[in-house]
């Protein structure tokens, strides 16, 4: 059995904390460790911030989409998507310290953080169509989902 949640919200920076807390609340039913929960919250924060700042270039007309799937074996799958400007070169964007917004004091560590905290990460992006992140984490001692 699996459990799924879908969420969409305006691409406003104040909605980043809403997304982070909502995803964390949903995941708690698997009883993750505090470290695992913190890592997932950080990843959601980084991904949503990237969508808002880079994908939509802070244009609040955009929408961020999140899907969370919890599997009975303790696997958490996240899909975070925007319909923004896309990433021209994903490999370059994933390099530590790479940023397209140095004037906004961006550290360029978002993808590096996501790769370190998740077991799997896949990025699909098309210029002028948007970016989708697929992320997966295996929780260590999670509870089975209730039937």
From Swiss-Prot:
Xref: InterPro entries: Anti-sigma-factor_SerPK, Anti-sigma_F, HATPase_C_sf
Record has Zinc as a keyword: no
GO molecular function: ATP binding; protein serine kinase activity; protein serine/threonine kinase activity; sigma factor antagonist activity
GO term, biological process aspect, one: sporulation resulting in formation of a cellular spore
Enzymatic reactions: L-seryl-[protein] + ATP = O-phospho-L-seryl-[protein] + ADP + H(+); L-threonyl-[protein] + ATP = O-phospho-L-threonyl-[protein] + ADP + H(+)
EC identifiers of the protein: 2.7.11.1
Keywords: ATP-binding, Kinase, Nucleotide-binding, Serine/threonine-protein kinase, Sporulation, Transferase
EC class (word): transferase
HAMAP family linked to this entry: Anti_sigma_F
NCBIfam families: spIIAB
Family in the record: Belongs to the anti-sigma-factor family.
Role noted for this protein: Binds to sigma F and blocks its ability to form an RNA polymerase holoenzyme (E-sigma F). Phosphorylates SpoIIAA on a serine residue. This phosphorylation may enable SpoIIAA to act as an anti-anti-sigma factor that counteracts SpoIIAB and thus releases sigma F from inhibition.
Protein name (Swiss-Prot/TrEMBL): Anti-sigma F factor
């Amino acid at each position: 059995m699996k459990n799924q949640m879908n969420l969409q919200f305006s691409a406003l920076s104040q909605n980043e904390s809403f997304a982070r807390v909502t995803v964390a609340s949903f995941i708690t039913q698997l009883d993750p460790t505090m470290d695992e929960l913190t890592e997932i919250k950080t990843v959601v924060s980084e991904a949503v911030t990237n969508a808002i700042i880079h994908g939509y270039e802070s244009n609040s007309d955009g929408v961020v989409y999140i899907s969370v799937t919890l599997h009975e074996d303790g696997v958490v799958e996240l899909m975070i998507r925007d319909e923004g400007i896309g990433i021209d070169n994903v490999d370059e964007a994933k390099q530590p310290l790479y940023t397209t917004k140095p004037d906004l004091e961006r550290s360029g560590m978002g993808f590096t953080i996501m790769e370190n905290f998740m077991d799997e990460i896949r990025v699909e992006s098309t210029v002028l169509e948007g970016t989708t992140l697929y992320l997966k984490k295996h929780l260590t001692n999670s509870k089975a989902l209730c039937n």
